């Protein structure tokens, strides 16, 4: 499957991306390479191959949740450049 420049432009519009002419050319080539690779993968005979989610056997690495103590407010704010009472103070980012 060969991807066209028009298809790349369409995908860019859907993603609300403004691409330059050079970027369109670059992405058209890159997406074409990716689709060619996927076509090769689709052509592989995987009959009789057991589906796996990991290439190597893995066991659940989760640990049990255990409640532990936390540091106090003063220790948490010890190195804060700005603070207001018991809170971190940060620059305003929304007008």
UniProtKB/Swiss-Prot annotation:
Q: Which SUPFAM superfamilies match?
A: Glu-tRNAGln amidotransferase C subunit (SSF141000)
| GO MF annotation terms | asparaginyl-tRNA synthase (glutamine-hydrolyzing) activity; ATP binding; glutaminyl-tRNA synthase (glutamine-hydrolyzing) activity
Instruction: List GO BP terms, alphabetically.
Output: glutaminyl-tRNAGln biosynthesis via transamidation; regulation of translational fidelity; translation
Q: What is its EC number?
A: 6.3.5.-
List, alphabetically, the Pfam families matched.
Answer: GatC
Q: Any keyword ATP-binding?
A: yes
Q: Which reaction does it catalyse?
A: L-glutamyl-tRNA(Gln) + L-glutamine + ATP + H2O = L-glutaminyl-tRNA(Gln) + L-glutamate + ADP + phosphate + H(+); L-aspartyl-tRNA(Asn) + L-glutamine + ATP + H2O = L-asparaginyl-tRNA(Asn) + L-glutamate + ADP + phosphate + 2 H(+)
Query: What are the alphabetically sorted keywords of the record?
Result: ATP-binding, Ligase, Nucleotide-binding, Protein biosynthesis
**Which spans of this chain does the record mark as coiled coil?**
none
Work out whether the entry's keyword set contains Transmembrane helix: no
Highest taxon of the source?
A: Bacteria
EC top class, in one word? ligase
Question: What interactions and quaternary structure are annotated?
Answer: Heterotrimer of A, B and C subunits.
**Into which family does the record put it?**
Belongs to the GatC family.
Q: What does this protein do?
A: Allows the formation of correctly charged Asn-tRNA(Asn) or Gln-tRNA(Gln) through the transamidation of misacylated Asp-tRNA(Asn) or Glu-tRNA(Gln) in organisms which lack either or both of asparaginyl-tRNA or glutaminyl-tRNA synthetases. The reaction takes place in the presence of glutamine and ATP through an activated phospho-Asp-tRNA(Asn) or phospho-Glu-tRNA(Gln).
Name this protein carries in UniProt? Aspartyl/glutamyl-tRNA(Asn/Gln) amidotransferase subunit C
Q: Give the organism the record lists.
A: Geobacter sp. (strain M21)
